[in-house]
Amino acid sequence: MDAWQADPENRKVSRAGDDRTPAFRWLGYCYHDRKHLGIPADNLMTMLREGGAKVPTGNRAGKGDQSFKKLSQSGILVNEIQWDIETPKGKVPWSALHKLATEPDFAKHEEAAQALGFSLFVKRARVGQTKHTRVRPRFDSWAASGTVTVLEDMITTDVLTSILEIAGRLCGLGDWRPSSPKSPGGFGRFSVAIEQIG
């Protein structure tokens, strides 16, 4: 992106503060493992922390954390680097999106996203004192699956279910989620199904 911006020829086709110019700018906000779009383990751990902060441990002695906020970080491990996102059209291959890096027409980016089962969400957002046009991938119907290892005895299957259900309802994942610190929104909510495998 820096090299693109440094080229004086590109100033003619770019508008400051508008993620649609250059059209490929939104690709920089996609998490992927070079194979598929996904939700990184770091984001999943943040979601577990935010959900854990809302689940009481039952410790009323006044000593230590009275929620599962800290225990969610020391007592749960996300086993994969990312959990791949699946749309009704399947997993989203990074190779199909990477090809768009040379496509200057934003409408073609929107068409490609639709063909892969998601949309490009265009929203005005405050950055500092000014409003900018931001573009992010939006998944109206999605699923992700993966495994976690629970190391803490206090985190039972019921507690883990509570943490994830509360996180899905009140915290979410991605930009403009309910727990976003500066600009919360209604996106990124999810429901959960847990299967114990060990």
PLM regions: where:
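RNA-interacting cores
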Residues: M1-G198
